[in-house]
Design a protein with these regions (language model features):
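N-terminal alpha-helical interaction blocks
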Residues: 1-70
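Short cysteine-rich clusters marking metal-coordination/redox-active sites
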Residues: 75-78, 112-115
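C-terminal, charged low-complexity interaction regions
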Residues: 185-327
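Polybasic, low-complexity binding patches
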Residues: 119-157, 161
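Short microdomains enriched in Cys/His and/or Lys/Arg
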Residues: 99-114, 133-147
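Short, flexible, mixed-charge glycine/proline-rich loop motifs
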Residues: 59-72, 81, 101-106
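Short flanking/linker segments adjacent to small metal-binding domains or redox-active Cys/His motifs
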Residues: 154-185
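Histidine-centered nuclease catalytic patch
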Residues: 82-108
Length: 327
């Protein structure tokens, strides 16, 4: 029987790394236009999905603005405010969206050192693997200003990873983020299925004529670590929801996932249990760099606290919906 995209498949269960390659540079997405690939992937399984009701929208303009939520005064991830000796924990400020993505919203006194180490690890890995060329191209202001790196590795391998280094002025920067099936917590999608639906793209500056000067006829997007990417989206949603909802009113369903260290290559088959996209809810054109919208997700006579996270909304990237807990 032919397999349909969206069907459970033990052979791919736990796959962490995905990328998209261009073997024909004439097929690159048009400059400055949202696109998607692959376009000929065949039939896919449609799942019943929940309904999101937005209650409050937080927008992030292209120019970074420093803002603060109320101090949390305990670790937003593990819930602790004291160590094993009963002494007050040292708590640091938690950026809702990583500062390197040009966002300035912080929650003071919200992360213990142990949890901060884990979140910093997956945020730092994603910066290097996915976001650094985008940060440079858009001149996003991070903690130390605009990224100073001037050369980035370009994957030119067909079957295996093979890197070439190209000056940033000619580096073919194409933003690639996964479009997901609905999360299993608010849809009929099987819990053991973790493939992306497709990839949403935005060509920032990839010019076939320029690439030919480097004798390149093929290249790939950065490999997306789906586990760490899901951790990032869940962390953004969880931190903002913890500020919006009174902590005593809901029980988090993603905090343990966020503060679990998944070393590179380690399997994980539950990272998309609470993180996904909605097919029946179309994303509108947006002038905002990023968006966070808090609300509820209704599914099977249940209403769950949920958050919509949309990074690079102005580039047409998808919204991710996270069920962050239960009331």
């Amino acid at each position: 029987m032919m397999r349909v995209r969206g069907d459970s498949s033990p052979s791919v269960e736990g796959r962490r790394y995905w990328k998209f390659g261009w073997n024909d540079l004439s097929a690159l997405p048009p400059l400055g236009t949202p696109d998607y690939q692959p376009k000929d992937a065949g039939a896919f399984r449609m799942y019943q999905e929940g309904t999101f009701h937005g209650k409050h929208l937080e927008v992030f303009p292209a120019k970074k603005v420093k803002r603060f939520l109320q101090p949390f005064n305990r670790c937003v991830h593990c819930g602790c405010d004291k160590d094993e000796r009963g002494e007050s924990l040292k708590l640091t400020s938690e950026h809702v969206i990583p500062e390197y993505l040009g966002a300035g919203l912080e929650m003071p006194a919200a992360s213990c050192l142990e949890c901060q180490k884990i979140t910093s690890e997956f945020e730092g890995a994603l910066a290097q693997e996915i976001f650094d060329p985008i940060r440079k191209s858009f001149a996003l202001q991070g903690k130390d200003g605009v990224l100073k790196k001037t050369n980035f590795p370009l994957d030119v391998g067909r079957e295996t990873t093979q890197h070439e280094f190209i000056p940033v002025v000619h580096f073919p920067t194409i933003m690639v983020l996964p479009m997901l099936f609905p999360a299993s917590s608010y849809s009929s999608r099987p819990t053991d299925f973790d493939e992306p639906f497709n990839f949403r793209m935005f060509n920032i500056n990839a010019d076939p004529i320029v690439l030919q000067k480097y004798a390149l006829d093929t290249f790939s997007s950065q490999a997306i670590d789906m586990v760490r990417f899901a951790q990032l989206i869940a962390k953004i949603a969880h931190v903002y929801a913890s500020s919006y909802f009174a902590p005593a009113t809901f029980k988090s369903t993603v905090a343990d996932f966020i503060r679990t260290n998944f070393p590179r290559g380690a399997p994980c088959n539950s990272h998309l249990e609470h993180v996904g996209c909605l097919w029946q809810r179309q994303d509108n054109a947006s002038p905002n760099l990023h968006e966070i919208e808090v609300g509820t997700m209704d599914w099977h006579q249940r209403s769950m606290p949920a958050v919509r996270v949309r990074l690079f909304a102005s580039c047409g990237m998808p919204s991710y919906y996270v069920t962050v807990g239960s009331f």
